[in-house]
Amino acid sequence: DLVXGTNFXKNNPXSTRVAANSXRSPSVYRQXXXXHAKKAAXPPAVVTLL
């Protein structure tokens, strides 16, 4: 998750705030929706689509 966030920040320096939010989102999804995390192969991928 951190690596993806770092790459995103490098690609889009202007959207540093979005990168910070995207880094926090995966942890929330994993804790709140364990069932969805099991169905999704990679929670960060879902966040990336959003």
Curated annotation (Swiss-Prot):
* Gene3D superfamilies named in the record: 2.10.80.20
Q: What is the lineage of its organism?
A: Eukaryota, Metazoa, Ecdysozoa, Arthropoda, Hexapoda
Question: Which UniProt keywords are listed?
Answer: Protease inhibitor, Serine protease inhibitor
Q: What is the stated purpose of this protein?
A: Inhibits trypsin and the toxin protease PR2 of M.anisopliae. Does not inhibit chymotrypsin, subtilisin Carlsberg, proteinase K, porcine pancreatic elastase and the toxin protease PR1 of M.anisopliae.
Which source organism?
Answer: Galleria mellonella
Q: Where is the composition biased (Polar residues)?
A: 8-25
* MF terms in GO: serine-type endopeptidase inhibitor activity
Name listed for the protein in its UniProt record: Inducible serine protease inhibitor 1
Induction, per UniProt: By infection.
Q: Where is this region: Disordered?
A: 1-27
Q: Domain of life here?
A: Eukaryota
Q: Which Pfam families match?
A: amfpi-1
Q: Which InterPro entries match?
A: FPI1 (IPR021066), Ser_Fungal_Prot_Inhib_sf (IPR053741)
